[in-house]
Amino acid sequence: VKATIENIRIAEQDRSYNSYVLAQKAGQAFPSIFTDYWHYHPEIEITYIVKGKGLAFIGNKTIEFEPGQAFLLGPYLPHNFVSTEEEDVQMEKECWGLQFTQEWLNSFKESASLQRLFRAMSYGINLGQFNPAEHQAFTTIVGKDPLRSIGAFFNLMAMIADRPDFLTVSTNNAYSNVMSQKLSRRMERVSKYIQDHY
C-alpha cells in the first residue's frame, strides 16, 4: 500500500496557510489522533507535539517523539505519528500543526534567507523541544487573530532559520512526489505492527 496523498485545500481557508489543533482527552475512545495514517502532501508542515508520545515515521526513518517536540516536514515527505502507549486510551494527546506552500512563502522576497532551511526540510527536521518563545509564537499562530497570527508565523520561521544547524531525520529527501512501493509497503507493515502490539 502506498502512502496516501492528503488534500489540504489551503485556498479554501480564510488564511494563507492552514493551522490546526488536534486534542484527545484521557479516556476518549479511539481512533487516536496519533494513528496509522502514512501520508504526504505538497505543503510544508510543522508538527508540534504538545501532549502524548510515540513514534514518528518520517521518510525512511523512525524516531521517538515526546511532549514539547516539533518537526518540520518538507513537501511530499511521507510521514506518520503513532502513539505507542500501552494504555493509549488513558493518555492525553494534543498536536498542533501548521501547513503552507513553499510557493506562498517564496512570494515574499524576504524569504530568500530561508533557502538553507528549505534544503534541510526536504529530509525532515527534528526541531527538538520548542523553547518558550517558539511555543508562544505557535500559540499565537493557532489563535483566532489573523493579523497577530501571520506576524507570529514569520517570527517562528525566523527563529527556526536562525538555528546554527538542523537535525535532519530521513536519509532520503522528499521523494519525487511518490516514494518507492517497496519502502511504502514496509513502513505500512511497521506502522500496523505498532498499532496491533502497543
Q: Predicted regions span which residues?
A:
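Conserved metal-binding segment of the jelly-roll/cupin
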Residues: 58, 65-85
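Ligand-binding loop in jelly-roll beta-barrel domains
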Residues: 76-96, 109
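Short, Lys/Arg-enriched, Trp-marked, Pro/Gly-tolerant hinge/linker segments that flank
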Residues: 125-129, 142-197
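Short, charged/polar surface micro-motifs in flexible loops or helix N-caps
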Residues: 52-53, 76-79, 101-105
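Residue-level recognition of the GNAT/N-acetyltransferase active site
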Residues: 59, 101, 195
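Generic protein-terminus/edge-of-domain signal
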Residues: 1-66
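Amphipathic alpha-helical segments enriched in hydrophobic/aromatic residues interleaved with Lys/Arg
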Residues: 102-157
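Active-site-flanking beta-strand signature of metal-NTP-handling nucleotidyl enzymes
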Residues: 48, 96-98
